[in-house]
Amino acid sequence: MAWAQLVRLPNVFTVLADVSAAFLLASHGTQPVSRFVTIVLAGVALYWAGMILNDVFDVERDQQYRPGRPIPAGQIAIGQARIAGWGLLLAGVGLATVAGHLPAGDAPTTWLPAAVGLLLAIVIVAYDGPLKKTPLAPVAMGGCRVLSFLLGASACFPIIAGEPLFPKYVVTIALGFGVYVMGITTMARHEDKGGPSPNLHLGLVVTALGSIMLAVAPQMSTNQAGFHVSPRDVFPFMIGMIALPVLIRGFGAVRDPSPLKIQTTIRVGILTIIPLAASFAALGAGPTWGIAIFLLAVPTIYLSLRFRVT
């Protein structure tokens, strides 16, 4: 139970969702399965590493302000947490490297997952360490989500000299997720205290911008015939309907900035990553995979009633 609290267990399904959705979008399915499974495990390992190291870096502050967290409460020794956090970080980069070299039919091996995994690990440590208390914290958090999505897609693309590493639409989707999360993180800067704050206004605008980027990004694809949903009308409508409740709650938090309203907005905003990711799975691999990713919301919602997601 203490470890589940430390890694913020409900949130892991958002990573399962966006890494899986990126692979499904790029590969139009789960083939090759070995690469799909391995790159998803890499994403989970890196995410859990970030969650654990977050509390390792914050242990002195948590002893004063959040003594109920597993490390200051004595449920998990700081040494154990350090070993687990750094070990998972190395495991995540290692799994990403392996994913690019597993057999994939005629597809060549690729070092792209290793490069993305290593860059993600660096940004995770930068956020957990020196950047968390600075204005760059939301940017770093958004960067983690950008790289998380690109990690999922990276196993599908070889590195070719003179060619872009990723298609433009994939990069724009990743940036859309990053901007969306950057907005949510900005709104969460003072969630425990509440009260009027420019962060709420700015965060709401940035979250809306991220949602718009997600809605229009597939239109940048040069091969839209492979999509299972029209990227010009149906898909933007889907994203709009998914993001709208988050934006409405955000607007309500701006008007009445109580801690409860802000925290509810953040919680809903984080959990909404799953249906957003499911939309891209459906776009690239069909409705069956879209539903499968969407169903990850079930354990997420159940577990979020028992564990904090922020």
What label would you give each PLM region?
Residues 29, 101, 109-110, 282-289:
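Transmembrane helix interruption/hinge and helix-loop junction motifs
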Residues 11, 15-19, 40-48, 89-93, ...:
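Alpha-helical transmembrane spans of integral membrane proteins, capturing the lipid-embedded, hydrophobic core
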Residues 27-31, 105, 159-164:
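Short, glycine- and charge-enriched coil/turn segments that flank and shape catalytic ligand pockets
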Residues 4, 143-310:
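C-terminal membrane-associated helical module and adjoining short loops/tails
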Residues 1-68, 75-89, 100, 113-123, ...:
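Topogenic membrane-insertion module of multi-pass membrane proteins
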Residues 40-41, 59-117, 121-124, 142, ...:
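Multi-pass membrane catalytic core of lipid/isoprenoid biosynthesis enzymes
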